[in-house]
Amino acid sequence: MLFRNETNLSSNDYIRFGGIKLDFSLCKRIIENISHVIVGKNQSIELLLVALLADGHVLIEDLPGLGKTLLAKSLARSIGGSFRRVQFTPDLLPADITGFNVYNQQTGQFAFQLGPVMTNILLADEINRTIPRTQSSLLESMEERQVTVDGKTYPLPHPFFVMATQNPIELEGTFPLPEAQLDRFLLKIRLGYPEKEEEIAILERFREKDPLIELEAAASPEQVAELQHTRKGIHISHIVQEYITNIVRATRENTSLRLGASPRGSLGLMRAGQALAALREREYVLPDDIKSLVIPVLAHRLILKEEERLRGTSPEHFLEEIINQIPVPAPTG
C-alpha cells in the first residue's frame, strides 16, 4: 500500500482524543473492492480515496487506454453512487454539462433538464480537448457543489466527486487548463503503463468476463458523506501545520518558479493529510503523511519559468528539492 515510510513518532505529540469514530474497515473495503477490477494500481486507488475523503477532486494526466474510465466506474460502483461521463470536445457547450431549461408546450412552462453534472461521480474525459469557456463551467460545481442556470441555483448530489482526465500537453489539439481551474483539483495523478506481470493479470482477469459487471457496492453515498464529515475531526498539530506552511512558502520563494502554491494548496495538503491518516487508521496526522502527499497535491499548481520549461525541468523536480531541504519535524518531549 501507499505511504508506509512513516516516522516513528510518539502518539502524544500528534493525537487528540476527541471521540472520533471512523469506520476504517469501510475505507479498506472500498479500496479492496476497486482492486477486484483494477490491477496493480494500489497507489492510484489510495490517492483516489484520499481525494474522495478530503471532499476534493482529481486530475488524471495520462494517455488513452490506461484504465481511467474503468477506475472511475469502479469507484462509483464501490460507493453505490451514480456515475456520468462527459467526453469533452471542441464543440461542447457549458449547458451540455450543467443542464438547460426546456420549454414545455403543453404546460406553457420551462422545465429544467438535468445535466450530467447531477451525479455522484463525474468523469470529465479529456477535459483539455475543449475550449476554456466550457472548461470553466465546471468551476462553480467543483467549488460550490451547485450549478446556476438562468439565475436559478440547483444543488448537486452529495458526495460530488470530479475525476477529470487530460492528455499530455505535448499532444496536438489540446487547450491547457488555466491556473484557476488547475488549482481546483486537490490531486493530480498518473496511472502509467502496467508492468509485464500486471498486464498478463489484466488479460487473465478480463479473459472470460468483465469484473466490473459483477462488482457490488462496498458502501453507500451516505456513508461516504459521513466519512467526509468525520475526516474534518482528524487532529493536525501545530508542528504539522508549520511543516505544511514551510513547504508551501518555499515554492513561492523558489526563483525558478513563476507561480508557487497558493493558500488553497496549503489547505489541500492539510485535508489530504487528514484523509490519509483516516485510511491509515489514525486520528492524527504525521509529518510523513504530508511529505508523501506534497507532489500529488502541489505539482500541478506550480508554473515554471520559461527557461526552466525549455530545459525540460518538471515541477516535481523542484518539489523533491524542497522536500529534501526542509527537515521533517521530530517528536517533542
Say what each PLM segment does:
Residues 47-49, 104-123:
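Conserved alpha-helical scaffold flanking the Walker A/P-loop in AAA+ ATPase domains
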Residues 111-120, 149-166, 177-186, 264:
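AAA+/SF3 P-loop NTPase mechanochemical coupling elements
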Residues 253-333:
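C-terminal engagement/docking regions of AAA+ P-loop ATPases
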Residues 53-89:
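Walker A/P-loop
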Residues 118-143, 157, 172-181, 193-201:
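Conserved AAA+/SF3 P-loop NTPase catalytic/coupling segment centered on the Walker-B
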Residues 82-94, 151-155:
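Short beta-strand-centered segment that lines the nucleotide-binding/catalytic pocket of NTP-utilizing
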Residues 24-58, 63:
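Pre-Walker A (pre-P-loop) alpha-helix and adjacent loop at the N terminus of AAA/AAA+ ATPase modules
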Residues 174-229:
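Conserved AAA+ ATPase core "coupling" helix
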